[in-house]
A protein has these predicted regions:
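Flexible beta->alpha loop and helix N-cap segments adjacent to enzyme active/binding sites
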Residues: 1-21, 25-26, 56, 67, ...
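Phosphate/ATP-binding catalytic cores across multiple sugar-kinase/actin-like superfamilies
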Residues: 38-64
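Short acidic-aromatic active-site loops that bind/stabilize oxyanions
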Residues: 25, 29-45
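Active-site metal-binding loops of divalent metal-dependent hydrolases
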Residues: 74
């Protein structure tokens, strides 16, 4: 029995309104929300069991380490990562910012270069950073704003101005330095809102053009 067939059978047995199943206009109704939550929990349990099995295998071979590095699309699942960190056998869990398919390609190339072609890994004192993308100067930003007719000003303290806007329940876009590598916004190209307002969940999703139920990453 497939997972989808199992969910359908259980939904009918438990008396859910099955007419809403898969209907994007009714995506938050119980049958859809509960299947999504159950699928997430199943994924978390499978993910955690895999990590625990890895820990046991390493320990059995005398190779136990305190460190775990996760990559691939599954490592973009933040609730699962949190459980692996809290409940798994590894003390330190690292998820690199480009853990999607693009990052896997980079990792495969580095593995080939260093492990198969035997090129040494050069020592570096440069701190690792996720901010590897493009940076733009004030003139470039002014031109981009002018093209769309957007008025701008330059406050003496941008952080204070942003904090005041957030306190006034405004949604702001934060643009700073180089852009992030990988699919996640990590503070240099981010949309920010006051988390104390439940309404901001809907507002930010509306600004981003996303479905109203989509979650956010706290920062």
């Amino acid at each position: 029995t497939t997972w989808s067939a199992h969910c359908r059978q259980e939904g009918e047995r438990l008396g859910y309104d099955m007419s809403a199943l898969g209907d994007t206009a009714r995506i938050t109704e119980p049958i859809n929300a509960d299947i999504a939550a159950s699928t997430q929990l199943l994924f978390e349990e499978t993910y955690l069991a895999t990590v625990r099995s890895l820990g046991k295998m390493l320990a059995g071979d005398g190779m136990m380490t305190k460190n775990l590095c996760l990559s691939g699309g599954t490592a973009l699942n933040c609730p699962s990562n949190s459980r692996v960190w809290r409940e798994g056998p590894f003390e330190n869990v690292f998820i690199e910012p480009t853990c999607d398919d693009g990052g896997l390609a980079i990792g495969a190339s580095l593995h080939l270069y260093h492990n198969l072609l035997d090129h040494p890994i050069a020592a570096s004192d440069t701190p690792a950073t996720a901010y590897l993308g493009g940076a733009y100067g004030d003139n470039e930003l002014a031109v981009a704003l002018a093209v769309d007719g957007i008025a701008s000003e330059s406050p003496d303290d941008p952080a204070e101005a942003a904090a005041n806007d957030l306190l006034a329940d405004k949604i702001i876009g934060w643009f700073e330095g180089k852009s992030e590598a990988g699919p996640r916004a990590l503070g240099h190209r981010s949309i920010l809102a006051d988390v104390r307002s439940a309404e901001n969940w809907r507002r930010v999703n509306q600004v981003e053009g996303r479905e109203p139920w989509r979650p956010f990453a706290p920062f």
